[in-house]
A protein has these predicted regions:
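Post-transcriptional modification and biogenesis factors for structured RNAs
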Residues: 1-100
Length: 100
């Protein structure tokens, strides 16, 4: 069974996001194991230090064998079909764990 890790900084506070996440976890859990991993926000006053520390905390929670898919508001947008194809291609090549 494939394993998806959703790794994020801080807790999801918005009720609508919590509800959507719960719905997707319920739907997908028939096909994949899903873990949601929340690392604490860093309180450093300097943004670059905060990003560095949070990045280190995220990386500590990701297995070396995991395929990392970075999700970024400013990143390349892909369709659900393309994401599914990407995951399928990786799975065929032996990858069973993905971290988002």
């Amino acid at each position: 069974m494939m394993h998806f890790n959703i790794v994020c900084v801080g807790k999801i506070k918005e009720a609508y996001l919590q509800s959507a996440i719960a719905d997707y976890v319920t739907r997908l859990s028939k096909y994949v194991k899903i873990d949601i991993i929340e690392v604490p926000e860093d309180n450093s006053p300097q943004m670059d230090k905060r990003i560095e520390k949070e990045g280190e905390m995220l990386m500590k929670r990701i297995s070396a064998s995991s395929c990392v898919v970075a999700l970024d508001l400013h990143g390349k947008e892909i369709s659900s079909e393309k994401l599914a194809s990407f995951i399928s291609d990786k799975a065929v090549s032996g990858v069973s764990e993905f971290s988002f």
